[in-house]
A protein has these predicted regions:
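Alpha-helical coupling/stalk and coiled-coil linker elements that connect catalytic or binding modules
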Residues: 1-305, 310-313
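Post-Walker A helix-loop "phosphate-sensing" segment adjacent to the P-loop in P-loop NTPases
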Residues: 316-320
Length: 320
């Protein structure tokens, strides 16, 4: 049975109550690759119960996750993958060409004709260099913005101690502090690009172009961010798990009734299945079915009697 056989795109749209791109990605992954580890399932259930019963925790976490958002945004893992594969560029060359521009300014006060010539050559050379190399920067800016949102969300989540989330808050706080050296540089690059427009900002942008400052900063960030990959991805996963649990708790509250699937060890419990009042989450007016069977069974019925729907129903509910 495949993802399309179970119409899991529609299932995803139905159960998706997430408010951040981290939670959206975590939910999609949870449907794509259901976990069999008891510890992970139990921790997810604990968080769902916490959010269902604790309004203060629910509102505090959701408020923080809204800072991350999910409009027109790629999943964090995709954005970070872009940075991991990005070429940092030739920082030494950028520094040399910026140094020549500074030298030209200095020569204006000693040998004006030579200074003008050096400045003109730097203006042309650095402009061409910036135009050619800035494509790398443009593709990385969204990833830098994603890192900044992750950090801002983690910082907001740590402002208020929430009972039951101490482990996540502590880990996110540690990761947020660990990322500060690199996020300062990310912020400089993002702010420079976002502030374009207006005479003062145009002068500021030209200043960065003339001295290749954003390319120098970009090279430093890309070279340094690779050592923070584990912390960034762990931060995205932790935030995603919290949003996922919030979403699942919200979805459960929208249902007339639900239960937790209980999976038994076949060697200990044998091959059996027991379901009561099972219904498909995509049907508006479903007819619930119950079944108890041990060993193999033969499911029969006339055409269009619901055999396939029942089998898909079993699979979808096992995943959910």
């Amino acid at each position: 049975i495949t993802w399309n056989d179970l119409d899991l795109d529609a299932v995803f749209d139905t159960v998706d109550h997430t408010v951040s791109v981290c939670g959206e990605e975590y939910l999609y992954t949870a449907l794509r690759m259901p976990v069999t580890t008891t510890e992970i399932r139990e921790e997810r259930e604990r968080l769902m119960k916490l959010f269902a019963e604790n309004q203060k925790a629910r509102e505090a976490v959701q408020k923080a996750l809204l800072l991350m958002g999910k409009e027109k945004m790629n999943p964090p893992t995709e954005e970070i993958a872009v940075l991991m594969e990005a070429e940092p560029g030739e920082k030494g060359k950028y520094l040399l060409m910026a140094g020549i521009a500074v030298l030209g300014i200095g020569l204006l006060f000693v040998l004006p004709p030579l200074g003008v010539a050096v400045l003109f050559a730097s203006m042309v050379g650095n402009g061409l260099m910036h135009g050619r190399e800035s494509k790398k920067l443009e593709s990385a800016l969204k990833a830098f913005g994603c890192i900044l949102r992750l950090q801002r969300t983690a910082r907001e989540l740590g402002k208020e101690k929430i009972s039951g989330l101490e482990m996540y808050q502590k880990r996110l706080e540690e990761q947020e502090k660990q990322l500060r050296p690199i996020t300062r540089k990310c912020r400089t690059l993002v702010n420079t690009k976002e502030s374009q427009g207006g005479a003062a900002n145009m002068i500021f942008a030209y200043f960065h172009t003339f001295f290749l400052l954003d390319l120098i900063e970009y090279s430093s960030v890309v070279s340094g961010v690779k050592s923070y990959e584990k912390a960034i991805l762990q931060m995205a996963e932790d935030l995603g798990l919290l949003d996922f649990a919030l979403s699942a708790a919200s979805y459960r509250e929208s249902l007339s009734y639900y239960c937790r699937p209980e999976f038994l060890d076949e060697k200990k419990a044998g091959c059996r299945i027991n379901v009561e009042e099972l219904y498909h989450p995509l049907l508006t007016h479903p007819v619930a079915n119950s079944l108890y069977a041990e060993g193999g069974i033969l499911l029969t019925g006339s055409n269009a009697s619901g055999k396939s729907t029942f089998m898909k129903n079993m699979a979808v509910n096992a995943i959910l």
